Amino acid sequence: FYVKRENVVDAAEAIVTTQRDHGNRTERKNARMKYTVQTMGIDAFRAEVQRRLPGIETFPAKELKFDTVEDHLGWHEQGDGKLYCAVYVSMGRIVDKENGPQYRSAFAELACTLDLPYIITPNTNVIIADIAPEQKDAVDAILAKHQVPHADGMTATRRVAHACVALPTCGLSLSESERALPGVLDEFDTILRELGLENDPILVRMTGCPNGCGRPYNADFGFVGRAPNKYALFVGGSIAGDRLAGLEQKVVIRGDISATVRPYLEA
């Protein structure tokens, strides 16, 4: 259903509390909201959410089409006279990396000196919001000071790539994901630039096990962990997220990934 713009936060809270009260949080494999919807049925789930919105009018769902899953990285107008800056965060890790981006220090300094709010995106990037035009130079200076990369210099593939956390955090993981994908993307970048595809948004996702928390099954290239340093390769999804990929190879060794994907990119 749809709600008016001013009721969006209330609707989101109703959805979250419905999942909290009706979802199975004791069994991790059955904890996600999609299983709650499957168990209750979409009509019952919708009715429960609406019940939690007393006095708020809801409207029939409209047809909605997403053309991309890409975040609007970089600087953009917010629509109210202010700006927002969407910052690429490698694998979603807000940490200070040795000899690399100091994400944590940058965001801490921005919060302390400019008191700006943050929004975390589904692609695990960070949007710095409510920036006054006169603050733009200060934000740029702080990001540059802490070596936070500018998205303009990245391939379109790197901008949209995503991995689940996997090892060592997740006990279900069979192989690396978050810690492996940056290196895989380096290899992709080399091939993409060689073939002139650096501006084509080719969706690459990696997950540490078949549960697929990294959403590999609708990516152009999805790598699904099977065993240490071994992945199943799924090919043929889309940047719009509206097409499932198919299993191409049951096992690809980590060191063979670049050689395996090159023929697909050359085709």
Put a short name on every predicted segment.
Residues 1-267:
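Peripheral terminal and linker regions in Fe-S/redox and tRNA-modifying enzymes
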